[in-house]
UniProtKB/Swiss-Prot annotation:
Cellular compartment(s): Cytoplasm
Pfam families xrefs: Cpn10 (PF00166)
InterPro entries attached to this UniProt entry: Chaperonin_GroES (IPR020818), Chaperonin_GroES_sf (IPR037124), Chaprnonin_Cpn10_CS (IPR018369), GroES-like_sf (IPR011032)
Gene Ontology CC: cytoplasm
Protein name in the entry: Co-chaperonin GroES
Main subcellular location: cytoplasm
Family (UniProt): Belongs to the GroES chaperonin family.
């Protein structure tokens, strides 16, 4: 299935991180802290400004981003894979 976000929305696949406890035990699943880094899978056309022009997004497909998993983030399953649909405003940084 293809998915195309609208306007300033971005589709992100969460990147898994390996968490280790203070005692050296590798934590997985619900015991591990969820990553706030992800890979951009798709981007919308851009934010519509008050004057009607469209400002392109600052991120592109393939970028690794740090995001804020707040109120506006929507979790979806696409082809059996969990993805996040969020606004560009929920992105905090691009990791180079």
């Amino acid at each position: 299935m293809n998915i195309r976000p609208l306007h300033d929305r971005v589709i992100v696949k969460r990147l898994e991180v390996e968490s280790t406890s203070a005692g050296g035990i590798v934590l997985t699943g619900s015991a591990a802290e969820k990553s706030t880094r992800g890979e951009v899978l798709a981007v919308g056309n851009g934010r519509i400004l008050e004057n009607g022009t469209v400002r392109p997004l600052d991120v592109k497909v393939g970028d690794v981003v740090i995001f804020n998993e707040g109120y506006g983030v929507k979790k979806e399953k696409i082809d059996g894979q969990e993805v996040l649909i969020l606004s560009e405003m929920d992105l905090m940084a691009v990791v180079d």
